[in-house]
Amino acid sequence: MTADTRPLHSGSRRLVRRTLLLFLCLILTLSAATLPAYAEDAPASSDVGVVLLLNLENNLVLYEKEADTPVYPSSSVKIMMGLLACRSLATRLNETVTVSSAMVAGITGRSLHLADGETLTVRDLLYAAICGGYNDAAAVVACLSSGSVAAFVEDMNEEAARLGMTHTNYTNPTGLHDPAMSTTARDLSIIAREAYGNELYMLISSARTYTVPATNVSEARLFTNRNSLISDSSQNYYNGYCAGMNAGMTDEGGWCVVTVCERNGASNLCIILRGLDVASGELIPAYVQANRLLSWANRNYGYRTVLSAGETLDTLRVGMTGISKSKADVVPSEDLKIYLPTDLDVEGQLVYDLVLDDEGLTAPLTAGDNVGTVTVSYHGSIVGKAPLTVTEDFKRNGFLNALGLFKGYLMGRSFWLAIPIFAIMLLPYLYATGSSRGRYGLRTVQRRKRIRYIKRHF
């Protein structure tokens, strides 16, 4: 038989080409479906000197640059100022106060132009200092909180020390440049977390605008939030997911932007320090970089279920049951979700540690009893915890229970305290028997020897 070497008709050739094309498309589709998705790199931050991006729920650092380098704090000082003022003045919001020239003496920079003798409410002053970023208002609330600006600065440094902000020193409540004043992004994240937990501070620092009503010396004053991520006055920077905190600049410290992005169930703290200043009309790099980083985090991080309720983590022996093979499944009592990279291999890159409340499991146990904690670590840091429970009941053996109580008594303090008391009580008897040794000496010796003999035989 000879092979058919006749050329294919054009219709047949088209059919072959279509078949091959469909086959190649199928291979490419399947390959794409099986390829792992890798997280993209964080956006470059060459125009800002210091960056820290932190997930607040899990205290997980998403991105950092020079986060432990001491820098001039610039306007970020107002986060500490605002928090302490909100704590101190929360019950006085409707109180009317009078500004004195002494309160604002020597204050320069961004100003609401508060006048000597002007009366306005504590609420107005807090909004002006925190939302508007006005230095003269910050000085007045410092005086209202602690009696003087100097005393308030002492309170700021005491709070920083209490919180463990070891690289931070304040010399004023405004952020105006002073070579003696410094902080780090890591330190700043500590006070920012505290401020995020203060409802009044977050309410004020998240306001887009505020109007100070007309006073005895001024017409009504409307201002926007100093932080352009919060204020929608500039669509170049506005981020509808951002809440609160602070922004501003000094020539020496550069631009600082601090905010919290609340999106998809996560709260991410973004800190930018030493941002470059630019000419009027150009985009401010600190704002641009903050938005880029927050968008990057939203694309590449999310909440992952790393433990499921009832999932057996280990099977451990249960003591005091009287049954040598009594074992209990140890399980988390609740699901645990942790904010992690979306491409993370949960099984391969997380470390799970079981920490039991006691050295081991001991009956009696009831299903659902908490017996310890499972901690989950990522890159050496604990990022989540869940309580551990057992799934069934275990009764204690009566004989082993009594034996355990007796052992506990022997090992207890009361037993050892009783020994010297018993010895003291025995002394009179020993003295009495010793004084009669001459009369009954032979009998006593014989009795002792007999006892020893019996002991040897037994």
Which residues are covered by each model-predicted region?
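N-terminal Lys/Arg-rich, disordered targeting/topogenic segments
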Residues: 1-12, 436-458
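Membrane-helix interfacial "entry" motifs
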Residues: 10-14, 120, 405, 409
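Coil-to-alpha-helix initiation sites in intrinsically disordered, low-complexity, charged segments
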Residues: 10-14, 88, 393-401, 449
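Sec-dependent N-terminal signal peptides
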Residues: 14-27, 418
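C-terminal segment of classical bacterial N-terminal signal peptides
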Residues: 29-38
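Active-site-adjacent loops and short helices of periplasmic peptidoglycan-processing enzymes
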Residues: 37-186, 190-204
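Domain-terminus/edge residues, biased toward the C-terminal soluble/receptor-binding domains
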Residues: 165-166, 180-182, 186-187, 192-442, ...
